[in-house]
């Protein structure tokens, strides 16, 4: 058996976050970096996101959101990160990342290509540094010096690697020193940081020279130590400069404090300690659990009654530290300083806000805090400083005996103005005390669906009756996951294929395309134009669709395109021969086109209309208001376009035109960019306004820091500095000065309001609305793409051989143009000299058709259309490019470039090749050159703003989301779509109208607003607020069984007295943090409202854990089928070491009852059929052939359910602890906590159960989840483990390595860098494949897909593979590393091989699993690289594309 593994959706959890200048460019501002397992994202803070009027407000408002600017996926998990400025890139921040086991990569964003480039690679892995260990390594830690002098990496916990950043060095040379060489006691490193304010880079280690445990705390405590080590990076010398011993034994984390305070904070589970080399230490204790276990002097804050284990912290400013606890609370730790402000006297600790359970905290721009979470949604918070005054409880006695002479002293006006009534204010200050507090509010949140603990499939919700098809072979379902933890616990409902809610549907024969045009005052559409083969149908939109009786539009011929001008006030219709302009119920103008050839394509963007005729002629019209409103033709023959197009190399047929209105301010001329300091303004007025705004911000900031009196006395310091050194006209210098000042102020009280302090380059749409520029994109038959300015029609950008789809598009230089012209002339001469036969001519025509750009558009996507995306259709594929600012040496041309996005959208469902191996004809219909556009941009559909719908055989929605950039979602549940238009109506707000291909049905629909389409997998998240352990769908009653728990503090201990267990209550003081074992409950959730069904809750006993929850089909005589589906649960009573562990098996059925009034979902009740305590812990359940298979610790029992009782049939002794069972007919796989996996066989005739085979590898890692891989008559077994491996086994008794069948043979092993806890098996998808007969469909369906979800929120699948496809893809996987460089320099084999890496006898064939994440990089290569790589493999490129697309579509599901 061969397999194919691919991760389809990126992780949503966030492990690391950092703030810095990661995007190149002078005016790009600062960004937030997040890394979740393998997914890197870079965000900017955008304060200009428009929020539509709601119930609270009547006007549009602007809110702040995080906007993804860049994203990419690594091959393996990142363990630690740091941010530094390296000498190679002094103007931007670089990212240092560590990987298994001791690898370090330094990466940054490349300015020219806007991709992740690798600056330096360091591998510290060798046998000597390992000291003989092969696993259980300490993860590599990387830290950077605050002054950017060097970085340090902890290697295997025993060595330190130093990376000096020498200014004049071209490369970064590292060296490794053993920690024992620095100091013999330096061992068991818990954490390390660089200290700020030292002359040389100084590393502070937190370590434990002699370890202790909680069990030995009464004998040995206060074992933690710190050591400050100064690093001389020139001489490679180390010197110990600071040591402190006898710190509390629970210390685990260090937080460096920047100067002027300096020093570091040490966080423990119960304590916080501040250490400084020049100041005596001070600390505080947070509970009474530590009484008697430390002699360190600590301030008593035991009344807080909390712990800081698993906490995270970050330094904010002015002696404030934010601390996030494991319960999801945000605390403020203040360093109280002496009157001089230089030394810390004490610590204050208080709760300030409730957040998600934080895993990382990062201070962004002043006043902004990012909370990264692995267990819940990540949040962007804004905080402001509030100062309140209160009277002191004790007032000083006032002095009565005042000197009468002193009162008579007269003060002149200057003294009064300068010093005021100082004495009176002094006395008032004594009577009042100022309290400072931080006020937080949430600005934005990044949704997280991880960690996925359990997963099941359920009935499709939100499924319209029009989409229900009885003949459909493929099932439609929802994927429901149990996500989050604690108060972040949630149910997530996922829909792979978009399912629009159909409002109405009607048959419309002969219709080809449709457009909704014209706007009423409430922004709803007036008309629906439907183009037919030889005519046009006009429908008026109101309460119903009614055919328009008035002759406003042209109905006697088919419509080519329709749109709106003047912001929707004018409706435009373009037919084959004329243009109609309609407004307010009357036709304003009808323009007859002066051409002998019909119009085949049109583009309508306010205020221009561009037309393309069948002979390739371009016509341009502009809407003018003088002397009256009309469309006026622009004389193209008088522009430079005519002379440019007439030249020899440009004299080719035009194949596509489109107009783009740029609101992003990216499309600027390169020459103008240089003269204006990096394109910082747009025009002089805007630049001046920006400078004024920045000066105002800095003035407000200075008032916060110094006060208004300083300005009055000494003048405005900001203005003086800027006037002396930086001219106001120079936008670049002003921005640079602003950034410099803000970075210096981070250590002080520089908290700003949300507007203007984001350090972001986001554009304000209210400011740029008047400066929108228009451009014409023209594609030529020879594969060239050109951009022209409107209305001048000047050539401002050219892309040569666009049909080659390179990874980077740049402007065509004069030299390249001349070279292309000579090559074309040689090719023409060669073709003229050699006569061609008919077959070769057909082949040439097909090749030209494959290279032709059939459609090319630039679409403004994302927030405020700030992300221009170039979309083009080449060779029946949609390619996507993102535009970014870049330098351009050609004067008068645009300073932009395009980078290819890793998305592959294929527009055909059949294979590219015929049975004879030749290119199959195009599926896209082109009649006489006329073809309707497939790319349909829209401003808003439901909750999606500025998206694109691509129609055709595989309809696809494209969303450029703020969450993670470009996402693609297929909408194949209604089959192919031939027409689409956005539609707004009073009854259907922001809906859609589309037309199906097969039945020609017109559907008015809306997308479900509850779902988040910016996620890689559209999801609806239902917050439950409890930890969800199991979720199972019960099909017969259409409800979900959900097992959840909440922690419940307990002071009870159970002991055995006279063979009976008894409770002992241990009284603790009120400041003791009691253990909180989970209290489990079972609820039924209805999919109607996604809330718990009333009166169905089952509570379990204290200390009883639900370990298994399954729906099982058991033999029954009361049903026709002979099987009855029940809900089975297994529990464990764990009362401690003395009490014998027991468990229960509970069998329930869900019955239907009469619902209670006003509670429609209360029509279900749980009826318990069987509930009995067992002699051991019940740890796993499943049904096998109508019987109940039950894991009880190290045994497996099989039961028969009869007469509401369980009768034992057979049992089997296993290894240590069986915790998961999966069955298929009469076989089952059992996962053991320590001994991997076993295959169990049950022989019903003999009532015998036996171990057929098992995984006996000594190096097998502790397993997490298992599932079957089914390929028709063949079965394989999947196993995921704690190190992120996925292993595939076979039962092959005839193979010599299987030892006669006793050993499961390892077919494949791969490490995906994330832990998998949930599998679901689905049958193969056939709807997207062109299959000829039923046998082929059945074979595909029986080749089942195993879908997995990880603890990081990512999804993927494993599929069986035919040997022919495997061999082709295996060769591709071997060679692709030589063509595509991997991010961070990760080697494909090294980073994806199973961990720990060691040769095993049973792993000879561990290469039989194709890594889909690697081989699918082939789809994103240029045409030249694809062809070259395919030639090296001995096949055509279409063979590989067909294989990969077939695998994608078989693994897709509704």
From Swiss-Prot:
User: By what name is this protein known?
Assistant: Probable cleavage and polyadenylation specificity factor subunit 1
Assembly: CPSF is a heterotetramer composed of four distinct subunits 160 (cpsf-1), 100 (cpsf-2), 70 (cpsf-3), and 30 kDa (cpsf-4).
Cell compartment(s), UniProt? Nucleus
Q: What does this protein do?
A: CPSF plays a key role in pre-mRNA 3'-end formation, recognizing the AAUAAA signal sequence and interacting with poly(A)polymerase and other factors to bring about cleavage and poly(A) addition. This subunit is involved in the RNA recognition step of the polyadenylation reaction.
A Pfam family found in this protein is: CPSF_A
* Superkingdom of this protein's organism: Eukaryota
Q: Which family does it belong to?
A: Belongs to the CPSF1 family.
Looking up PANTHER family in the UniProt record yields: DNA REPAIR/RNA PROCESSING CPSF FAMILY
Q: Where is this region: Disordered?
A: 736-765
Q: Name one GO molecular function term.
A: RNA binding
Which InterPro entries has this protein been placed in?
A: Beta-prop_RSE1/DDB1/CPSF1_1st (IPR018846), Cleavage/polyA-sp_fac_asu_C (IPR004871), RSE1/DDB1/CFT1/CPSF1 (IPR050358), WD40/YVTN_repeat-like_dom_sf (IPR015943)
The primary gene name is: cpsf-1
Q: Biological process (GO) annotations? A: mRNA processing
| Any GO CC annotation of this UniProt entry | nucleus
**Keywords on this record?**
mRNA processing, Nucleus, RNA-binding
């Amino acid at each position: 058996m061969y397999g194919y593994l691919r991760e389809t959706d990126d992780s949503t959890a966030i492990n690391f976050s950092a703030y810095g200048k990661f995007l190149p460019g002078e005016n790009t501002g600062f960004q937030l970096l997040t890394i979740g397992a393998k997914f890197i994202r870079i965000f900017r803070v955008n304060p200009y996101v428009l929020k539509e009027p709601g119930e609270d407000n009547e006007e549009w408002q602007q809110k702040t959101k995080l906007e993804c600017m860049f994203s990419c996926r690594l091959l393996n998990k990142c363990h630690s990160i740091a941010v530094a400025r390296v000498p190679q890139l002094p103007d931007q921040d670089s990212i240092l990342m560590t990987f298994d086991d001791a690898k370090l990569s330094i990466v940054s964003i490349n300015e020219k290509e806007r991709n992740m480039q690798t600056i330096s690679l360091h591998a510290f892995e060798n046998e000597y540094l390992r000291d003989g260990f092969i696993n259980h390594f300490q993860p590599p830690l990387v830290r950077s010096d605050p002054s950017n002098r060097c970085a340090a990496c902890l290697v295997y916990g025993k060595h330190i690697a130093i990376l000096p950043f020498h200014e004049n060095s071209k490369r970064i040379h590292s060296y490794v020193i053993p920690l024992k060489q620095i100091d013999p006691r330096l061992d068991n490193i818990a954490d390390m940081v660089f200290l700020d304010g030292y002359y040389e880079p100084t590393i502070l280690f937190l370590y434990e020279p002699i370890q202790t445990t909680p069990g030995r705390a009464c004998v040995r405590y206060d074992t933690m130590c710190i050591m400050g080590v100064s690093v001389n990076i020139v001489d490679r010398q180390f010197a110990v400069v600071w040591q402190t011993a006898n710190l509390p034994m629970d210390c685990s984390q260090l937080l460096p404090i920047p100067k002027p305070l300096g020093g570091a904070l040490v966080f423990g589970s119960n304590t916080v300690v501040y250490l400084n080399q020049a100041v005596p230490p001070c600390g505080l204790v947070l509970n009474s659990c530590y009484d008697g276990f430390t002699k360190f002097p600590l301030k008593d804050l035991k009344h807080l009654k909390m712990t800081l284990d698993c906490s995270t912290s970050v330094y904010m400013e002015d002696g404030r530290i934010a601390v996030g606890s494991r319960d999801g609370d945000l605390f403020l730790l203040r360093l109280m300083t002496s009157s001089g402000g230089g030394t810390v006297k004490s610590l204050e600790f208080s709760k300030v806000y409730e957040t998600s359970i934080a895993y990382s905290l990062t201070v962004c721009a002043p006043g902004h805090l990012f909370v990264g979470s692995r267990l819940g949604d990540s949040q962007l918070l804004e905080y402001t400083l509030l100062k309140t005054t209160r009277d002191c409880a004790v007032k000083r006695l006032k002095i009565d005996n005042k000197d009468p002479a002193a009162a008579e002293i007269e003060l002149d006006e200057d003294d009064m103005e300068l010093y005021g009534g100082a004495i009176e204010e002094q006395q008032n200050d004594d009577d009042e005390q100022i309290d400072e507090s931080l006020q937080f509010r949430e600005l934005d949140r990044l949704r997280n669906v991880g960690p996925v603990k359990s997963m099941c499939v359920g009935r499709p919700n939100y499924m319209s009756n029009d989409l229900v098809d009885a003949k459909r072979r493929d099932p439609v379902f929802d994927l429901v996951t149990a996500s989050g933890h604690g108060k972040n616990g949630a149910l997530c409902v996922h829909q792979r294929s978009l399912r629009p809610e159909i409002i109405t549907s009607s048959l419309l024969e002969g219709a080809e395309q449709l457009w909704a045009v014209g706007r009423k005052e409430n922004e709803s559409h007036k008309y629906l134009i439907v183009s037919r083969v030889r005519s046009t149908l006009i429908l008026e939109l109101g309460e119903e669709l009614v055919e328009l009786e008035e002759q406003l539009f042209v109905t006697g011929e088919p419509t080519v395109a329709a749109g709106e001008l003047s912001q929707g006030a004018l409706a435009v219709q373009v037919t084959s021969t004329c243009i109609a302009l309609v407004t307010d119920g009357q036709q304003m103008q009808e323009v007859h086109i002066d051409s002998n050839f019909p119009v085949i394509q049109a583009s309508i963007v306010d205020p221009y209309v561009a037309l393309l005729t069948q002979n390739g002629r371009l016509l341009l019209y502009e809407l003018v208001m003088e002397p009256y409103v009309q469309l006026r033709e622009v004389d193209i023959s008088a522009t430079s376009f005519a002379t440019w197009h007439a030249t020899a190399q440009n004299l080719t047929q035009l194949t596509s035109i489109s107009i783009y209105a740029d609101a992003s301010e990216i499309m600027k001329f390169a020459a103008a960019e240089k003269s204006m300091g990096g394109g910082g303004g747009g025009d002089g007025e805007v630049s001046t306004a920006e400078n004024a705004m920045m000066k105002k911000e800095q003035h407000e900031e200075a008032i916060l820091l110094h006060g208004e009196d300083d300005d009055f006395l000494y003048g405005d310091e900001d203005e003086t500095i800027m006037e002396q050194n930086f001219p106001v006209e120079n936008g670049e210098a002003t921005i640079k000065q602003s950034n410099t000042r803000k970075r210096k102020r981070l250590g002080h009280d520089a908290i700003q309001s949300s507007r203007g302090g984001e350090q972001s380059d986001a554009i304000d749409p209210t400011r740029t609305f008047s400066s929108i520029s228009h451009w014409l994109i023209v594609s030529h038959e020879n594969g060239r793409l050109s951009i022209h300015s409107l209305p001048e029609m000047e050539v401002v950008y050219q892309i040569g051989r666009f049909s080659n789809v390179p990874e980077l598009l740049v402007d065509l230089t004069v030299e390249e143009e001349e070279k292309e012209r000579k090559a074309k002339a040689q090719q023409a001469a060669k073709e003229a000299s050699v006569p061609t036969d008919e077959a070769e001519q057909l082949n040439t025509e097909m090749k030209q058709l494959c290279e032709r750009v059939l459609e090319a558009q630039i679409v403004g996507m994302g927030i405020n259309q700030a992300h221009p995306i170039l979309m083009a259709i080449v060779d029946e594929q949609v390619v996507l490019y993102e535009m970014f600012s870049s330098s351009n040496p050609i004067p008068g041309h645009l300073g932009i470039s395009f980078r290819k996005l890793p998305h592959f959208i294929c527009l055909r469902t059949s294979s590219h090749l015929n049975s004879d191996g030749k290119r199959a004809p195009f599926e896209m219909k082109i009649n006489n050159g006329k073809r309707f556009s497939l790319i349909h941009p829209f401003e808003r559909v439901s909750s999606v703003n500025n998206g694109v719908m691509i129609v055709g055989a595989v309809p696809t929605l494209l969303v450029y989301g703020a969450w993670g950039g470009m996402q693609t979602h297929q909408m194949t549940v209604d089959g192919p779509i031939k027409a689409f238009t956005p539609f707004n109506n009073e009854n259907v707000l922001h809906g859609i109208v589309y037309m199906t291909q097969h039945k020609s049905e017109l559907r008015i629909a809306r997308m479900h607003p509850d779902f988040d389409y910016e996620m890689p997998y559209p999801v609806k998240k239902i917050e439950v607020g409890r930890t969800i352990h199991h979720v199972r769908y019960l099909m017969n009653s259409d409800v979900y069984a959900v097992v959840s728990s909440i922690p419940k503090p307990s002071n009870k201990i159970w002991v055995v007295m006279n063979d009976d267990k008894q409770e002992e209550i241990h009284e603790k003081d009120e400041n003791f943090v009691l253990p909180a074992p989970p209290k489990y409950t079972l609820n039924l959730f209805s999919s109607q409202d996604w809330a718990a069904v009333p009166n169905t809750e089952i509570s379990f006993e204290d200390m009883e854990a639900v370990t298994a929850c399954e729906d099982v089909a058991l033999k029954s005589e009361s049903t026709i089928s002979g099987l009855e589906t029940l809900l089975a649960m297994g529990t464990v009573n764990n009362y401690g070491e003395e009490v014998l562990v027991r468990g229960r098996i509970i069998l329930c059925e869900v019955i239907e009852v009469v619902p209670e009034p006003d509670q429609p979902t209360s029509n279900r009740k749980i009826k318990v059929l069987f509930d009995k305590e067992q002699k051991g812990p019940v740890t796993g359940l499943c049904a096998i052939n109508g019987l109940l298979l039950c894991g009880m610790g190290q045994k497996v029992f099989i039961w028969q359910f009869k007469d509401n009782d369980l009768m034992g049939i057979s049992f089997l002794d296993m290894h240590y602890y069986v915790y998961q069972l999966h069955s298929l007919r009469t076989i089952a796989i059992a996962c053991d906590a320590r001994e991997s996996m076993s295959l169990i066989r049950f022989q019903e005739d003999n009532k015998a159960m036996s171990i057929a085979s098992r995984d006996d590898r000594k190096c097998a890692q502790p397993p997490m989840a298992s599932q079957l891989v089914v390929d028709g008559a063949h079965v394989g077994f999947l196993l995921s483990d704690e190190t992120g491996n996925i292993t595939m086994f076979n039962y092959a008794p005839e193979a010599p390595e299987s030892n006669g069948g006793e050993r499961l043979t390892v077919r494949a092993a791969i490490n995906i860098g994330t832990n998998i806890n949930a599998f679901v098996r689905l049958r193969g998808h056939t709807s997207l494949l062109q299959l000829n007969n039923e046998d082929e469909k059945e074979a595909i369906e029986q080749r089942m897909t195993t879908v997995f979800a990880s603890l990081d929120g990512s999804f993927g699948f494993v599929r069986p593979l035919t040997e022919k496809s495997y061999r082709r893809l295996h060769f591709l996987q071997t060679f692709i590393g030589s063509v595509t460089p991997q991010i961070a320099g990760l080697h494909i084999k090294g980073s994806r091989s199973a961990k720990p890496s060691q040769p095993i006898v049973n792993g000879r064939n561990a290469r039989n699993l194709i890594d889909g994440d690697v081989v699918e990089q082939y789809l994103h290569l240029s045409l030249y690289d694809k062809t070259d790589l395919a030639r090296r493999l001995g096949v055509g490129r279409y063979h590989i594309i067909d294989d990969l697309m077939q695998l994608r579509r078989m693994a897709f599901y509704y």
